[in-house]
Structures are given as C-alpha cells and as structure tokens.
C-alpha cells in the first residue's frame, strides 16, 4: 500500500467543497514567505563575531546552498557582506550540501589549512558537508532545526551570545589539542 503525500490545497478544497485558485494561493504563500524572510534581523551575536574576527585578523568565508544573488542580497540588506573574504553559493559548484564541494572551495579561496577552519552551521546537511570536508563544525540550530538531535557536530551552541569569539577559539583550540593527544596515545 502506498500513501500519497498530504496536499494542503487539496485538503482545503475538500473542506470547503469547491475548487480554489491554486496558482494565486501559491503566489500569495511565496510572497508571505519572502516577507517573513526579509523581516528577519541578524541573529544575535553574528555581527559581533564578524567584527571580532576582523579585529583578530581572521579570514571569513561563507558557503551557502542557496543561489548567489539570494545570499548576497540578504548580506547586503543586513549590512554584513563586507565582513566576508569570500562567498560561495550553489551557482559556484556542481553539488551543494551535504557534498563538501562548497566548503572545499571556500577553504581553498581563503588559503587557510583545513585544520585551522571553524564552520558555524545551522543545518544537518551543512554539518555533514563540513565534516566530509574535514572541518571543525559548530552547530547553531535555527528555528527549524532546534528540535533535531545530532552528534555529528563537534560542538553545539544555542546562540553566538553564549560565548565570546575569543573564548570560543580558546575552547576549540583546547578541544583539538585534547583530541590530538588522545589520538597519539592510542
């Protein structure tokens, strides 16, 4: 027995007993989704981390499975685009997350050894991609992923406000040192 996927428009038509202007409803839904996306502010701590990274002389890159114009449009709207040394998006690669191609490209463009890279991710596919690229990954779940459970990331933060960038870097350095020393002892 196969079960068909739930279609909310079909269910609504069934409930009201008449057909609905589907295309018009879909357009309204997309417009509302866009309105919600465009009203979202910068997440807490993001701007401070980017400013601190600049002051520390750290290179910053962004890897997104979205289209480049979407990504750069949001970064410009939020006043964050100038913080990034490189930005790579779906248009720049053959395969997006969970494939590591995006992260590999960003790391290559930054000219930083993979073992010195820290990835901040909000999606499970992003975590998988970062780990496949051999990168240290910190998971900061978003509203959609906060209820998920994953042990794939090296560290989880609920918000960048939980810890300063300098304290986080010290913690990550300590954690990496402990991992390396355990590996050599085994």
Give the location of each predicted region.
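N-terminal helical cap/lid subdomain that shapes the substrate entry/recognition surface
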Residues: 1-56
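Asp-based, Mg2+/Mn2+-dependent phosphohydrolase catalytic module
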Residues: 51-55, 67-186
